[in-house]
Amino acid sequence: GSVGRMMPGMTSRILDPDTMEEIPDTEQGLVIYRGGNVFNGYLKNPEKTKGAFHNGWFITGDLGRFDEDGFLFIEGRLSRFSKIGGEMVPHGTIEQCIIDAFKFDQSDGYVLAVMGVPDPGKGEALVLLTTLELTVKELRQKLLEANIPNLWVPKVIKQVEAIPVLGTGKLDLKGCQDAAQAALSS
């Protein structure tokens, strides 16, 4: 759903995350904004400030789009996408497709996480971390039956005792990334 419209005094733009060029607001891209309520930078940390802004606009790290009525829809975090063969592949969407296809229950906590790891041929490759027993063949079959593009099907599955989470209950992206990297090394 929508997170609403921009507050009065705020301006936003949608950028192509690769080129940082402005694209139509109704296309999915990197959300940036500026306004009187946006901070000016990190205290005594000009390098971090430089990375957080683009030409005076704050870089949210969110991928989103606006509808015709000006409502903003956040569709993911840039850090939760992989670029594979030039295409942006959303980890959260793949995770939800796997949960739906296999009718997995995550009411007691995470049972899976999709992560991107470097791949010399395609840029990145997808690794599925899961607490459940699942084969690549089963995964591929179910996702293709659900009309998920082949490019979005994780090629590596790593069974883990638990999906790394933070004290807040959110995915520990660093822990998941480390586990995904380790899966390729083993």
Task: State where each predicted segment sits.
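Conserved AMP-binding/adenylate-forming
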Residues: 1-69, 78-81, 94-97
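Generic structural signal for residues in well-ordered beta-strands
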Residues: 12, 111-114, 156-157
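AMP-binding/adenylate-forming catalytic core of the ANL superfamily
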Residues: 35, 40-41, 63-152, 175-178
